[in-house]
Amino acid sequence: MSDENNSGAAAPEAQNPGQNAAQPAVRLQILTQYIRDLSFENAVAQKGLPSGEVQPEISVQVSLDARKRPAEHQYEVISKFRVQSSNATDKSPLFLCELDYGGIFHVEGVPEDQLHPFLMIECPRMMFPFVRRIVSDMTRDGGFPPFNMDPVDFVALYRQEIARRTQAQRPADQPLS
């Protein structure tokens, strides 16, 4: 018999045998996923083909947001991706793809102090393969080779955001350590 529940997470007693066995198991269910906003701009088609050699440089920016929904145990998570490509030789824009992708999740059994990181790491991680496919399809349909995004480290992204917020709250005259 397996120590995993339907969501693939190990049962609490398997994770920490010394913990209280009465702690509820984590339950995560994707209720729906959707494109909230999508934009693709092909600068090459608008301005004409660039002269000389084209060496694309691609940058990807990711931001996340989560909020509680009125229904019990339901949360909406929005991941925003901005994929911008420019010519490395003259910095002229090639394309811009912006995607806001959302999901509504049913989450139970996550302690309150761990809920925010859970929503900002695990939920976007589950949605990422769909985001990656949409961006790949959009770049291909926009007249460019398909762009397959590298996996995003949502743990590192979360830590960076927490560090940024902590830094923003620190008074300007207070030393860093």
Curated annotation (Swiss-Prot):
GO molecular function: unfolded protein binding
Gene3D superfamilies found in the cross-reference section: SecB-like
Superkingdom per UniProt: Bacteria
Pfam hit, one: SecB
Gene Ontology BP terms: protein folding; protein tetramerization; protein transport
Composition bias type Low complexity, residue spans: 8-22
Subcellular localization, as worded in the UniProt entry: Cytoplasm
Alphabetically ordered keywords of this record: Chaperone, Cytoplasm, Protein transport, Translocation, Transport
Function description: One of the proteins required for the normal export of preproteins out of the cell cytoplasm. It is a molecular chaperone that binds to a subset of precursor proteins, maintaining them in a translocation-competent state. It also specifically binds to its receptor SecA.
Family to which the UniProt record says this protein belongs: Belongs to the SecB family.
Name by which UniProt lists this protein: Protein-export protein SecB
